[in-house]
Amino acid sequence: MKKGKKLYEGKAKIIYATSDKNLVIQYFKDDATAFNNLKKSTIEGKGVLNNRISEHILSNLTQIGIKNHLVKRLNMREQIIKLVEIIPIEFIVRNVATGSITKRLGIEDGTVLKQPLLEYCLKDDKLGDPLIAEEHILAFDWATKSELEKVKKMILRINDFMIGMFRGVGIKLIDFKLEFGRLKENGKNEVILADEISPDTCRLWDSITDKKLDKDRFRKDLGDLIPAYTEVAKRLGILHEQSNLSAVNVTKLRSVKKRK
């Protein structure tokens, strides 16, 4: 499949056109940002790991009936994905209180929530991705009521699945961000899961030590990000357990194939 012109560049990914008008290529960058782009860096190998981890999670979600934009991983940094119209909302799912919510509401960090909490933020870097209510979404036609109801049902299933998946490898799923888009097929729009699911978009803590295995390592200067992301990939079975990876050699990873 031929890669065409660049259609869009965000903080962590670039979208390219292809020879198929219904498909695009998603390229994972090594750029790391935090605090609405106020803190920036380039971390060699981050894009490779996020590509592999997101492919693994989205593929597993497909198996349980969660339709998403992933078609296949093209190479170490790129995926072929379905072209969707992104709904301009970030859906934040919280299982444990940490980060901005603790400051906003004066809640003790690490408080386990009685049930998953869903928050909405408008995707707008210039405005700082402000927190909004469901009424805002409906009032400004960012999504319809039926679209929101479908998204909420998908989110509950995704959360249940991911909690179990990570728990099985000794990781607590603290919170995560999801994005959804409208897929146009046969003249109709269908809302599906889009973007990525990776340590860039999730907070992941070791189940025993509470060690941060996500982008908070960059946000809070807790140490190198690559070993933490590599640890997540190893635990999920994406990489050989014996692999000792660094930011230098991570880009040379090859696909792990099951032995017959």
Swiss-Prot record:
Pfam family, one: SAICAR_synt
Family matches, as PROSITE patterns: SAICAR_SYNTHETASE_1, SAICAR_SYNTHETASE_2
The UniProt record lists the keyword ATP-binding: yes
InterPro entries for the chain: SAICAR_synt/ADE2_N, SAICAR_synt_PurC, SAICAR_synth, SAICAR_synthetase, SAICAR_synthetase_CS
Record EC number: 6.3.2.6
Keyword presence, rRNA-binding: no
Leading EC class: ligase
Protein name: Phosphoribosylaminoimidazole-succinocarboxamide synthase
Native species: Pelagibacter ubique (strain HTCC1062)
